[in-house]
């Protein structure tokens, strides 16, 4: 089955909904420019610790930056657009986000594989680094998926309505959704979360 990450979580209720409906991973944004930023909250450790066992906790950055040691201990993977991951704690998996507009971008993404455990394809935006609601280029994502030696995760404009088409075209290792299951930036619509995950499962079952 294609795995599911629900990204941009900001409260325990949304964490419990995502995990309860079957998300394999949840994302927490540590990029200050994002409306889903949680890095300055007093309860950030409690939020990270609210994730149930066997659900992967992903810290999401635009430009990679350091976090206090107590925060690093509470996450399992780091996702970033730019910056080297060489100083990260050894237990962290590294997800390199790439934005594809041309086949040259695909070739560049392939060269980044050595510094990542997975590649995440997101939609290109000139000012923003994710969570825009714009759809990624599925043709280029499939090209990357076919050539990559590391798992490819598809993000960018996914919704309950289009996720099955996206999986059929790209055949990714996982899908990643944020704005496509929200009622407002940073606030998840639990019915949309449920529908998104259910649709991925139905696709996997061939129904």
Predicted ranges, named:
Residues 1-207:
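Conserved N-terminal beta1-alpha1 strand-loop-helix module at the mouth
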């Amino acid at each position: 089955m294609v795995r599911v990450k629900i990204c941009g979580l900001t409260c325990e209720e949304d964490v419990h909904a995502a995990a309860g409906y079957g998300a394999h991973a949840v994302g927490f944004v540590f990029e200050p420019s994002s409306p889903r930023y949680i890095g300055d909250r007093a309860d950030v450790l409690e939020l990270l610790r609210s994730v149930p066992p066997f659900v992967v906790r992903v810290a999401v950055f635009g430009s990679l930056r350091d976090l206090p040691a107590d925060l690093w201990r509470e996450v399992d993977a780091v996702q970033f657009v730019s910056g080297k991951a060489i100083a990260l704690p050894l237990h962290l998996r590294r997800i390199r986000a790439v934005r594809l507009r041309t086949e040259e971008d695909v070739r560049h993404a392939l060269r980044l594989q050595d510094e990542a455990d997975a590649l995440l394809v997101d939609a290109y935006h000139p000012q923003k680094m994710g969570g825009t609601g714009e759809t990624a280029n599925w043709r280029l994502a499939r090209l990357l998926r076919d050539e990559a030696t590391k798992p490819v995760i598809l993000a960018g404009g996914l919704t309950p309505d289009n996720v099955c088409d996206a999986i059929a075209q790209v055949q990714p290792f996982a899908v990643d959704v944020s704005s496509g299951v929200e009622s407002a930036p940073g606030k998840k619509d639990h019915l949309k979360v449920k529908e998104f995950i259910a649709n991925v499962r139905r696709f996997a079952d061939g129904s």
